[in-house]
Amino acid sequence: MKLGVVGLPNVGKSTLFNAITCAGAQAANYPFCTIEPNTGVVAVPDKRLDVLAEMYKPEKYTPATLEFVDIAGLVKGASRGEGLGNKFLSHIREVDAIVHVVRCFEDDNVIHVDGSVDPARDIDVINTELVLADIETVTKRSEKAAAMLKKGDKKYATEKEAGEILLAHLNEGKPARTAALSEDQRAVVQDWFLITMKKVIYAANIGEEDLGKDENELELVKPVREIAEGEGAQVLVICAQAEEDISQMDPEEKQMFLEDMGIGQSGLDRLVVLGYKLLGLISYLTAGPQEVRAWTITAGTKAPQAAGKIHSDFERGFIRAEIVPYEDLVREGSIAACKEKGLVRSEGKEYVMKDGDVTLFRFNV
């Protein structure tokens, strides 16, 4: 699963990405500084793993991860291929959800591509380009569906209906994800790969002078919240510059800095956790002296498919899953103690995995 980081030039997108991955993507003060997408794999913060590591003292510690892609800066006209438009559109189609970085800080030293700071306008610029790209896609698919219907292929009826609803919706400047589609219609348009069907986190990038202030009172953040509420999108207030500085600190220094600022968790950690949830992901855990590990699965995954994340043989020869909830294991102190109290459950092929299940799979091939 991938999260694409997008934004107009000079809004702090590459600075945020540097902080996310410590990858050092060039954050130059001019448009088009990042042409190819940089990709970074980030650990998902999970205190449960730290507790299990203390219990088991494992040789290996492996957290769940999330992939972020820094997508080239966008300008007006991208949907027509202007600027880096064609590259932008191809890269953004490949991600599963979008982190849209919005500039919510004033700084005379950082040029704004439109000459002034206006979060609502910036959001509209990018969203308009994405909507225009989707209109082109939907128009082509609708025309194809209509042609196939004329030839008597009735299976295209749902596609045609969905296309009509989507075109009317997109032409109002609204994202595809908020269109009133039936389940059947939503299913048939999945392989249209519409950009505005993807879920969005608006990362409101504030200046360091606004750190520690009431986020709800920040004037430049208010329009971002209003737009997000109308779309059913998420908002995360973050200071990319501070996060880049924090990302270069050692763990103790980072903790002291966060405590001094009165912050429980860094903005980046909150972004990663929010992204994980937005993608509908959960973690089951495995623990022992060799390794403590979080395994990423989609919510609703059944035990055999979860086992397949470890190895295909585990799924093919699945017998059962021995499961103890994380809270029970920590309270009792060991799997043996949990077994004595009857807290270890044996689950079969239809069991739907839960976040925090500490699991041992039994299989035979």
Name these PLM-found stretches.
Residues F32, D46-L49, T62-F68, E82-D96, ...:
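Amphipathic alpha-helical transducer elements in NTP-driven molecular machines
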